[in-house]
Amino acid sequence: MKKVADKQILMAADFAGYPLKEEIKKYLEKKGWTVTDVGVKADSDPNDTELMFHRIGLRVGSMITEKEFERALIFCGTGMGIHIAASKCPGVHAGVVESVPAAFRAITGNGVNVLAMGAFYVTPELGKQCADAYLYNDFGSGWEWWPDFDKFHQIAIDELNAFNYEEYKANGFKVKHLGDCHCELYDRPEGLSPVPLMCKR
């Protein structure tokens, strides 16, 4: 598997997301990242129907499912359609973000392995900041002050990975618990940034 710790990232975009993807791709490559791009390229044929947003989303999702890559960045006009498609693949936890705090929380709290952005709403500069927040942090990063933060959120990830709708329905629409953890919310200590960019890579 190509891992973020080794500065390996999968990227893809449809035609609407292409301009934003290109800006972020160049930015990351300048920082030493190896980018594997499986979407629209400069010379792509606009009539190639394999490059429709949902087909690219499924392509990326399948590469995460097959453990070719640990994480991916994907782009379309809104980020929504390509994210819905990628989410159809088993084990994919995709999120759409339009802010740096959302990108930070997507990885640190939800373990998102596919992050989507929309070129209609996210500027290149904001997109670069979102990419940094996502790629330079890991699950649980920056939440050490919240007791059991990672345990609480890992239960959700595990139950979502194991989710089977027919079993859920047969169980009276109740989730099969794979663990439990108290749900107390904690206030962030005063002066602590909600987005501590922990640039480890």
Regions from the PLM with identified roles:
Residues 2-4, 64-68, 107-109:
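Solvent-exposed alpha-helices and their adjacent loops that cap or buttress functional pockets
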Residues 10-20, 100-201:
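C-terminal binding/interaction regions
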Residues 34-49:
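A short beta-strand-loop structural module common to alpha/beta enzyme folds
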Residues 46-58:
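Structural motif
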